[in-house]
């Protein structure tokens, strides 16, 4: 698990190293939809040109919706803004997602990771000079690799090779990658 976390941190670092140092604007945000699901998150977006910005959102929750499901995720994204002022009006985004999850739902245990890519479309309203409200919706492909078993199964015996447990479920989902309402504050 520490290796996966380090990879996620490295991916976020590389994303921001690519952004121009003399960025015109920096924005910090939180997605209200995730907050309502008890998955606190924070994001940082850096404007890189007249029509572009890059950003990353991270979230972590020890109990999504109060269930015993732990979730950590990172979502880097490139956005193209259709207006001549980034972080204003219509945009389309291309991004990725990396997630680690573990928990039990209806006596079935899940433990694994997922990665994916997707496209996002949205609109930003400027409430004040520094405060914005954003609505967005996204769709993409998500690959997962996980251990999946019912409580009481002999998972540790049945799915062990050379002393290491292996995943017994992997595949792809086509699903919404980002749907929500965000509140953002322009720092610079």
Which stretches of residues belong to each language-model region?
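Membrane-spanning beta-strands of outer-membrane beta-barrel proteins
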Residues: 25, 37, 71, 114-116, ...
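Transmembrane beta-strand segments of Gram-negative outer membrane beta-barrel proteins
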Residues: 23-32, 92-94, 177
